[in-house]
């Protein structure tokens, strides 16, 4: 089983799709990585040689601009923490668990707010 950046890639999938299982790598970036490494994108993960896996890992680690897995998760968490600390609008919305990109919250936003909290009716 190929292991890249601490992630086990699914054996039966094409390497181009398998690379997208790494946090921070999408379809476009996966194809660019394979092009740089000189690996055929149609190769199945189980058919990769150790040399090809090493080439792919080297290409991923060589680019300091594009973070993957733990480093990227840490940077995103630090950005959110900074927003909360400075007390800006987005930070306050993050703190309250509400959407911070301008969506309406009167009816929707259930993903952020969680399940409905029903209020009992008063009897007359």
From Swiss-Prot:
Keyword terms, alphabetized: Ribonucleoprotein, Ribosomal protein, RNA-binding, rRNA-binding, tRNA-binding
Annotated segments matching region Disordered: 99-124
Protein name from the UniProt record: Small ribosomal subunit protein uS13
Keyword NADP carried by entry: no
Biased composition (Basic residues): 113-124
Record gene name: rpsM
Keyword Iron assigned: no
Any one Gene Ontology molecular-function term assigned to this protein's record: structural constituent of ribosome
Similarity comment: Belongs to the universal ribosomal protein uS13 family.
GO biological process, one term: translation
Quaternary structure, from the entry: Part of the 30S ribosomal subunit. Forms a loose heterodimer with protein S19. Forms two bridges to the 50S subunit in the 70S ribosome.
Function: Located at the top of the head of the 30S subunit, it contacts several helices of the 16S rRNA. In the 70S ribosome it contacts the 23S rRNA (bridge B1a) and protein L5 of the 50S subunit (bridge B1b), connecting the 2 subunits; these bridges are implicated in subunit movement. Contacts the tRNAs in the A and P-sites.
CC terms in the record's Gene Ontology section: cytosol; small ribosomal subunit
């Amino acid at each position: 089983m190929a292991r890249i950046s601490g992630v086990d890639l699914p054996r039966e999938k094409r390497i181009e799709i398998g690379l997208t299982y790494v946090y921070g790598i999408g379809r476009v970036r996966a194809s660019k990585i394979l092009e740089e490494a000189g690996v055929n994108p149609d190769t199945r993960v189980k058919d990769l040689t150790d040399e090809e896996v090493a080439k792919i890992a080297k290409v991923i680690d060589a680019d300091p601009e594009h973070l993957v897995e733990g480093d990227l998760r840490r940077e995103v968490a630090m950005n959110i923490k900074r927003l909360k600390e400075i007390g800006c609008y987005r930070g306050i919305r993050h703190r309250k668990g509400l959407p911070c990109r301008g969506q309406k919250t009167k009816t929707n936003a259930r993903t952020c707010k969680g399940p409905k909290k029903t209020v009992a009716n008063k009897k007359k």
